[in-house]
Amino acid sequence: MSVLPCSINTLKVLYDISGVEVGQHFYWQIGGFQVHAQVLITSWVVIAILLGSATIAVRNPQTIPTDGQNFFEYVLEFIRDLSKTQIGEEYGPWVPFIGTMFLFIFVSNWSGALLPWKIIQLPHGELAAPTNDINTTVALALLTSVAYFYAGLTKKGLGYFGKYIQPTPILLPINILEDFTKPLSLSFRLFGNILADELVVVVLVSLVPSVVPIPVMFLGLFTSGIQALIFATLAAAYIGESMEGHH
């Protein structure tokens, strides 16, 4: 007879833990609008980290690079190679866009894997990595969509829309639908992976000693980096595809 109360208590504990998964949003009221303050705060932190580290590393550029300058030159070379591989010979103007996407997502993801934002106590709501919020990932995906439309129209003019009836006009609905599925897949893939990783870290830190979650955190760092690479690679591939034609 004691099985039922025990099961109910177990379910209650699991339900309480699942509350971390849903979370509480931290809002600012600006005029008549509710703003997701947790996204703005953590995004500002990420931007400050990127700008601060870049400024410190290259404030005194040397002919023979120092450690910091050498690291950022390596990152730039990596992003240039990625852009050239996916976009082609006309990759140059798109390096800043692809680089910004990659670095912002990479540092945002790592902040979620290294910093248990949700444990930070606030009067109400909670903090989370920027990419833990669906609004951020959707915004990044929409920026990518705008970028590849702009790239295609700039290269081909109105002839860009001819891709929708290739190789046959019968595929017009599917080709149009593809433009909606691209940002959806980009945004939900990034959001789902980062949310799951951050929740695992938060739950383990809450339930077990701090040493135990370390392997999970290292795995989170790896997957976070992979997700940033996937997003940047797909963004560059979409831009390259829009400039070259429909494949």
UniProtKB/Swiss-Prot annotation:
It comes from the Eukaryota. Gene3D superfamilies: ATP synthase, F0 complex, subunit A. One of its GO terms (cellular component) is chloroplast thylakoid membrane. This is ATP synthase subunit a, chloroplastic. The gene is atpI. F-type ATPases have 2 components, CF(1) - the catalytic core - and CF(0) - the membrane proton channel. CF(1) has five subunits: alpha(3), beta(3), gamma(1), delta(1), epsilon(1). CF(0) has four main subunits: a, b, b' and c. It is a multi-pass membrane protein. SUPFAM superfamilies: F1F0 ATP synthase subunit A. It comes from Buxus microphylla.
